[in-house]
């Protein structure tokens, strides 16, 4: 059975915050359920928090303190992202059957508006507003309406998407939140400081705010500069279909709603649907992108245009960087692992195998222990369910470690035959934070290795003692 994909609804905006540089996780970093402030960001990660940015025209943001979680007495936990003009929007949502109230409300809003006329996103951290019944739905709608009202909108249908993250099964302190929305609106700004504070406001067990931005051009307007910015949160309960992961992406490029949804869906399948921290899929996952066209130019209206092809590459790279950043901040993580499955008869089967390896507790714990136990990797390949017959042929399968320093691969298994492994070199490779595992299927039964075989990439982290500590103490 192929890995499930994040469900796409209508035309929704995607918002995602990422860092442009890799982040080094710190073992033993104690995580508190609150938005990180400067003093709590691990020293090794502070340098990856951007000191400046290039932000899209027409967007303003704010991060305010509402005290959603009683223990949070000062950190921002209410975020507002707002466009001065109506946006095309696209979004993807969790496929968990117990979809949180904000997921239901936002997906409904996008369907009603066909991805048009969206103005912003309001987010609270500290309470997921999931499995909260009719009251939870009412509260999510109230947040959307309040954001509209504070920005002078009085339409019957709301135009603000809603996101929440935190503990499941608890009602929002809704009056506390609603009373702070006017402050969030008055604090809206387009400065780097405002974007950074907003990225902090959506964090929970994250150890640092994840924010990035970049400029780009399109073939139809090579002299025109566009910008894209994103923020995200996520460190645990991470596995497609997305998993306590919220992402907000904003761009000033002109993109029509149906095309925007196509762009987002393509990028998600190769980014957020290709990561895993712990194999759990959250009730609240949402990634949205908003495009307000404020930078001008010819709107992207066709999937067959050169602008569409260029934008597809830009957005996919952007979301991949963000997705990788989430893995790098995985709860208790000490390793950032890329698993590449090569020469498969199909992309779907290759991705399914990569996902199975990434979710294996035995593989993850071996990597944490710096144990080159490649048998666990091979075992995961062998028990991957519902593959197309002939995908995995033992005598054609090879496994190797690819070091982060660019040196030669360490071959562990070649065409089904074990290699004489240099344990010293294997141990040296596993001392590094970054590692790539390469599984070559040799074309499966077809034997088409190197001649058009399909490849898939997945990113994951290891399991450490700290992961258990963090999640054992999550509600305390």
Swiss-Prot record:
- GO terms, molecular function: glutamate N-acetyltransferase activity; L-glutamate N-acetyltransferase activity
Active site annotated at which positions?
244
Catalysis: reaction(s): N(2)-acetyl-L-ornithine + L-glutamate = N-acetyl-L-glutamate + L-ornithine; L-glutamate + acetyl-CoA = N-acetyl-L-glutamate + CoA + H(+)
Q: Where does substrate bind?
A: 204, 233, 244, 331, 471, 476
Q: In which pathway does it act?
A: Amino-acid biosynthesis; L-arginine biosynthesis; L-ornithine and N-acetyl-L-glutamate from L-glutamate and N(2)-acetyl-L-ornithine (cyclic): step 1/1; Amino-acid biosynthesis; L-arginine biosynthesis; N(2)-acetyl-L-ornithine from L-glutamate: step 1/4
Q: Which compartments does it reside in?
A: Mitochondrion matrix
PTM per Swiss-Prot/TrEMBL: The alpha and beta chains are autoproteolytically processed from a single precursor protein within the mitochondrion.
Write down the position(s) of the site called Cleavage: 243-244
- Write down a Pfam family by its short name: ArgJ
Spell out the Gene3D superfamilies in the cross-references. Answer: arginine biosynthesis bifunctional protein suprefamily (3.30.2330.10), ArgJ beta chain, C-terminal domain (3.10.20.340), L-amino peptidase D-ALA esterase/amidase (3.60.70.12)
Provide the top EC class.
transferase
The site (Involved in the stabilization of negative charge on the oxyanion by the formation of the oxyanion hole) lies at 165-166
Instruction: Provide this UniProt record's keywords sorted from A to Z.
Output: Acyltransferase, Amino-acid biosynthesis, Arginine biosynthesis, Autocatalytic cleavage, Mitochondrion, Multifunctional enzyme, Transferase
Give the GO cellular component terms, alphabetically.
Answer: mitochondrial matrix
Q: Which PANTHER family match?
A: ARGININE BIOSYNTHESIS BIFUNCTIONAL PROTEIN ARGJ, ARGININE BIOSYNTHESIS BIFUNCTIONAL PROTEIN ARGJ, MITOCHONDRIAL
Question: What more does the entry say?
Answer: This protein may be expected to contain an N-terminal transit peptide but none has been predicted.
Protein name (database record): Arginine biosynthesis bifunctional protein ArgJ, mitochondrial
Its source organism is Arthroderma otae (strain ATCC MYA-4605 / CBS 113480)
> Upper lineage ranks?
Eukaryota, Fungi, Dikarya, Ascomycota, Pezizomycotina
């Amino acid at each position: 059975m192929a890995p499930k994909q994040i469900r796409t609804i209508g035309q929704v905006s995607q918002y995602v915050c990422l860092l442009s540089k890799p982040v080094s996780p710190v073992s033993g970093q104690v995580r508190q359920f609150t938005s990180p402030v400067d003093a709590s960001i691990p020293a090794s990660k502070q340098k990856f928090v951007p000191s400046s940015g290039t932000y899209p025209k027409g967007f303003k943001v704010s991060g305010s303190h509402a005290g959603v979680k009683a223990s949070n007495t000062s950190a921002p936990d209410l975020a507002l992202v707002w466009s001065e003009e109506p946006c095309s929007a696209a979004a993807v949502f969790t496929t968990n059957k117990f979809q949180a109230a904000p997921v239901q409300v936002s997906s409904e809003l996008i369907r009603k508006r066909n991805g048009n006329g969206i103005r912003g996103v309001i987010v609270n951290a500290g309470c997921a507003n999931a499995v909260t019944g009719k009251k939870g739905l009412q509260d999510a709608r109230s947040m959307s309406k309040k954001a509209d009202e504070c920005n002078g909108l009085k339409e019957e249908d709301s135009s603000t998407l809603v996101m929440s993250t935190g503990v499941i099964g608890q009602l929002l302190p809704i009056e506390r939140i609603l009373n702070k929305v006017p402050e969030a609106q008055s604090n809206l700004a387009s400065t780097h400081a405002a974007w950074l504070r907003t990225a902090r406001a959506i964090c929970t067990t994250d150890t640092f705010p994840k924010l990035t931005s970049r400029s780009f051009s399109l073939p139809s307007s090579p002299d025109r500069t566009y910008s894209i910015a994103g923020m995200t949160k996520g460190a645990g309960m991470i596995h497609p279909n997305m998993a306590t992961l919220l992402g907000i992406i904003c761009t000033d490029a002109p993109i029509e709603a149906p095309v925007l949804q196509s762009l987002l869906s393509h990028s998600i399948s190769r980014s957020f649907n290709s990561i895993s921290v712990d194999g759990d899929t959250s009730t609240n996952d949402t990634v949205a992108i908003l495009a307000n066209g404020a930078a001008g130019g010819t709107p992207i209206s066709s999937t067959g245009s050169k602008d569409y092809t260029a934008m597809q590459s830009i957005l996919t790279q952007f979301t991949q960087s963000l997705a990788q950043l989430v893995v790098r901040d995985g709860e208790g993580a000490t390793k950032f692992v890329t698993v590449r499955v090569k020469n498969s008869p199909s992309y779907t089967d290759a991705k399914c195998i990569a996902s199975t390896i990434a979710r294996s507790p035995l593989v993850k714990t071996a990597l944490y222990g710096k144990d080159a136990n490649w048998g666990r990797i091979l075992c995961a390949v062998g028990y991957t369910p519902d593959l197309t017959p002939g995908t995995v042929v033992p005598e054609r399968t090879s496994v190797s470690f690819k070091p982060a320093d660019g040196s030669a691969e360490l071959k562990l298994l070649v065409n089904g035959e074990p290699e004489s492994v240099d344990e010293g070199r294997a141990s040296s490779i596993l001392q590094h934070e970054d590692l790539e595992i390469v599984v070559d299927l040799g074309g499966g039964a077809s034997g088409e290795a190197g001649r058009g075989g399909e490849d898939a990439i997945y990113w994951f982290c290891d399991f450490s003692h700290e992961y258990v500590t963090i999640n054992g103490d999550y509600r305390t």
